[in-house]
């Protein structure tokens, strides 16, 4: 049984109902509908922490989806799963692929910045301030791009940029 038919979460059920209505009324090719169904099931599995199942659904959605913009969101969500699993290198690969297809994806830029910042903190703990600064500078670049795309978002990142003197460098 598809995951979308066994949701217990109210928000997931609501999303599923709205998505099913849209699938019926918006004209799209059968492959696109099937890709969206896998994407929706992947999001549902991901929200429940079922990451292996989410990845299976996202990979199937990628196989079927042809639109680069839609593929960017699938790739972004695959990156989220890898981030949740602590697989930051893999996550970055998927965030970069998402940004190649959709450069206006501030959440992918933000998550890339978060990983760079995390790596900077790791370098500090390991006693390597030069490497830490390089990671923090990279984080700043990605956050500035994300903030440029979504000025009202990422307030904590904006504060960090100001406090560390990296805002607008």
Swiss-Prot record:
TPR repeat start and end residues: 35-68, 72-105, 120-153
A Gene Ontology BP annotation from the UniProt entry: photosynthesis
Keywords tagged on the record: Chloroplast, Membrane, Photosynthesis, Plastid, Repeat, Thylakoid, TPR repeat
Topology in the lipid bilayer: Peripheral membrane protein
InterPro entries (UniProt xref): PSI_Ycf3_assembly (IPR022818), TPR-like_helical_dom_sf (IPR011990), TPR_rpt (IPR019734), Ycf3/AcsC/BcsC/TPR_MFPF (IPR051685)
Localization annotation: Plastid, Chloroplast thylakoid membrane
GO cellular component, one term: chloroplast thylakoid membrane
Pfam families: TPR_1
Role: Essential for the assembly of the photosystem I (PSI) complex. May act as a chaperone-like factor to guide the assembly of the PSI subunits.
Family that this chain belongs to: Belongs to the Ycf3 family.
Protein name: Photosystem I assembly protein Ycf3
